[in-house]
Amino acid sequence: PVEMLTGMSQDLFGAQLTRTLTDSNVGTRFNIVNTRPTTLAFVELTDGQASYTFYDENSASRMITPTDLPALSPDITTLYFGGISLCNIPAADTYLALAERETSKCVIMLDPNIRPGFITNEAAYRTRLSAIFAVADIIKVSDEDLEWLIPGPADIMSKLAQLQAGRQAVMILTCGKDGARALLPDGTDVAVSVPPAVVVDTVGAGDTFNAGVLAHLHSGHSLTKAAIGQLRG
């Protein structure tokens, strides 16, 4: 079972989103419902690659604050954070507050999915990412994310190891057609290949990958903080 926690508008689009979530068996009991407008997102595809435009000023999802956060029920065991929700305040600081509040009880997975064009305050964003990295149990990045996080000539796996340093976290690197790599908490490097595929578009590809990781760990009874810390190659 999956629940969503976000700011949700009472407008037409918010009602449509809520119905779609319900039809997809995604719970909405933790959503913070308000009268602000729904964020609008537009996608343009070029050779299967997506570029995005968002209209998000004063939106229902962006304007939530830490005081809006609901208490989570004991059946919530894992929290997933990522994307542009971590870029702009007040929502970005609200999600950080949630992660820090729940890290002792819940597995935290983070996919920063860094989009430089949406970052309005780079220094604050880097500080926020460092704080949420510190409480995350699973961190998934792309090579583009790593290049932004750790600029310089070092090879990509060295940068992934640098990001893992001092953390008992599983680090996952997606490599497109070359599959994925992971550094386990003990430093073991695991590589997984993927079969060739014809790319139609990449919208939702990262989210689907992350859902697969969490579903696999859940099905193997490994989606707990203790089990993740003991993962071995």
State where each predicted segment sits.
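Phosphate- and divalent-cation-binding pockets in alpha/beta enzyme and binding domains
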Residues: 16, 41, 118, 148-149, ...
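Conserved phosphate-binding/catalytic region of the ribokinase-like
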Residues: 152-233
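Conserved beta-alpha-beta core of the PfkB/ribokinase-like small-molecule kinase fold
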Residues: 78, 83-161, 170, 178-179
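Short, hinge-like loop/turn segments at secondary-structure boundaries
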Residues: 20-23, 46-49, 125-129, 156-159, ...
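A short, N-terminal amphipathic alpha-helix
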Residues: 1-3, 23, 161-165
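A short, aliphatic-rich alpha-helical micro-motif
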Residues: 72-74, 132-133, 165
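Conserved N-terminal subdomain of the carbohydrate kinase-like
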Residues: 3-81, 108
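Acidic, amphipathic alpha-helical patches
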Residues: 69, 129, 199
